[in-house]
Amino acid sequence: ARESTRLTCAAVTGPQTTLDPAQMKEWTPNSSYGGHAFGFKTFAEFLAGRESILPLIAEYSPYALVSADDPAVYMTFGGPPAIGQNQKDPTHTANFGAKLAEHCATKGVSAELHYRGLANPKHATPTDFLLAKLKAAK
């Protein structure tokens, strides 16, 4: 029998869902992390050099890679999103999850955003999400 290696779903904690410094700055003005992945020493250099790395962003950024046939994703964060506002932890802000979930919705992909303090979450933990998806896949 042959089995697929395609994911059924994914559950992640505090993901950085874009590698695009312009998106990072728009979503979270005090973003300061990520440029080192492309050889930039500072975030200002990362932002200024964005045009030169657009092909890499298109190839590797989770946000850029979303397609209609992607599996469901669950993202959990330490607090609620606040798009366009400085964050205590800009590297792991729920702004990343909110914007990816919004983008996934435009492609028809299920994306569940969870954060500490969320009232009545569909799944309270990544494990709950994974179990529900894996049991449904049988």
Where would I find each of the regions flagged by the language model?
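Short amphipathic alpha-helices and their capping/turn segments at secondary-structure boundaries
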Residues: 2-7, 58-68
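C-terminal catalytic histidine-bearing segment of alpha/beta-hydrolase fold enzymes
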Residues: 73-88, 94-138
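Noncatalytic linker/hinge segments flanking ATPase motor cores
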Residues: 16-19, 49-59, 112-121
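Hydrophobic beta-strand segments of well-ordered beta-sheets in folded domains
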Residues: 10, 71-74
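Residues at the C-termini of beta-strands that transition into short coil/loop
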Residues: 11-14, 36-39, 117
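Mobile cap/lid helix-loop segments that gate and shape the active-site cleft of serine hydrolases
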Residues: 21-65, 92
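Primarily recognizes the serine-hydrolase "nucleophile elbow" in alpha/beta-hydrolase
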Residues: 1-28
